[in-house]
């Protein structure tokens, strides 16, 4: 009997969720959608690993890996971004944050210092000929390394990458 009461109570509580009715708060704003990165645009085969952040000035920065020749994790991969100064309604041209010839610059992780406005971008690098399985097996030419870049002008320009691998990556990590 106790189990029946519990199941009945759960069904009664779940009923409004299953009714198909949706409620919208009075102050809800409509969501605007936009395609920021599209396969084949700007000479890149594929864009992956998106990351977004809103700057102290309110600019939306949308980072991605721009994969030049395929969607593969190996090869010539650049870190790019697009900026929006109107909350995401329109987007500026692609800005290349980091291009290291045929190597992999990826995994963007942006952070904004709310006091100074500086945008920090953590990222990884690996040799463009190294495959993921080889990196994990520790048979690759090089290892995956960690870098930081920064912008003090709301994402318009970026510092050169500075390697921080020894201070953030344990020896047993790939």
Give names to the regions the model predicted.
Residues 22-174:
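Asp-box/BNR beta-propeller blade signature and adjacent active/binding-site loops
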Residues 10-18:
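Hydrophobic h-region of N-terminal signal peptides that target proteins for export
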Residues 3, 18-19:
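Intrinsically disordered, low-complexity Ser/Thr- and Pro-rich stretches
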Residues 8, 20-23:
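N-terminal targeting leaders only when they are immediately followed by extended low-complexity/repeat-rich tracts
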Residues 2-9:
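Sec-dependent signal peptide recognition
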């Amino acid at each position: 009997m106790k189990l029946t009461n519990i199941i009945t109570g759960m069904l009664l509580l779940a009923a409004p969720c299953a009714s198909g009715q949706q409620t919208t708060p009075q102050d809800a704003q409509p969501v605007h959608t936009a395609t920021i990165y599209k396969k084949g645009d700007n000479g890149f085969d594929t864009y992956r690993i998106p990351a977004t952040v809103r700057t102290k000035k309110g600019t939306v920065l949308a980072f991605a890996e721009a994969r030049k020749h395929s969607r593969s994790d190996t090869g010539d991969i650049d870190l790019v971004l697009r900026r929006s100064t109107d909350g995401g309604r329109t987007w500026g041209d692609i800005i290349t944050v980091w291009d290291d010839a045929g190597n992999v610059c990826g995994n963007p992780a942006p952070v904004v210092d709310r006091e100074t406005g500086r945008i920090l971008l953590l990222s990884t690098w690996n040799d463009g000929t190294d495959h993921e399985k080889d990196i994990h097996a520790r048979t690759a030419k090089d290892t995956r390394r960690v870098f930081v870049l920064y912008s003090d002008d709301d994402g318009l320009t970026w510092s050169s990458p500075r390697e921080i691998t020894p201070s953030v990556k344990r020896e047993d990590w790939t």
